[in-house]
Amino acid sequence: MGKRIDDETLKKIRLPKEGEIFGVVEKMLGNDRVQVRCVDGKTRVARIPGKMRKRVWIREGDVVLVKPWEFQPERADVTWRYTRVQVDWLKRKGKLDERVTKLLEEIIPGA
């Protein structure tokens, strides 16, 4: 059975903090790394931190928040993964950048 999401859960959806940007997972690279296409037009290799490794499963086409490294901007850390329901809610509320929707359609046609 699917999970039921209520309004209170949706209100707790995490929005980007300073230094974080939206991205879409293009490719799983292995060794807890993913290739993410970000809304700023760059493709980064993002690391999945230890606290997310076994708790949050990330797949190709998922919308994620990444925090680029200051000293190596072509790399980043994944800080959050959004579910499909959360992505739909963000689109309806206008919180999700239009560029993310375009990235989703490029990576997964018909998304």
UniProtKB/Swiss-Prot annotation:
It comes from Methanopyrus kandleri (strain AV19 / DSM 6324 / JCM 9639 / NBRC 100938). The keyword Transcription does not apply. Belongs to the eIF-1A family. This is Translation initiation factor 1A. It holds the Pfam family eIF-1a. It comes from the Archaea. GO terms for molecular function: RNA binding; translation initiation factor activity. Keywords: Initiation factor, Protein biosynthesis. Residues 11-83 form the S1-like domain. Seems to be required for maximal rate of protein biosynthesis. Enhances ribosome dissociation into subunits and stabilizes the binding of the initiator Met-tRNA(I) to 40 S ribosomal subunits.
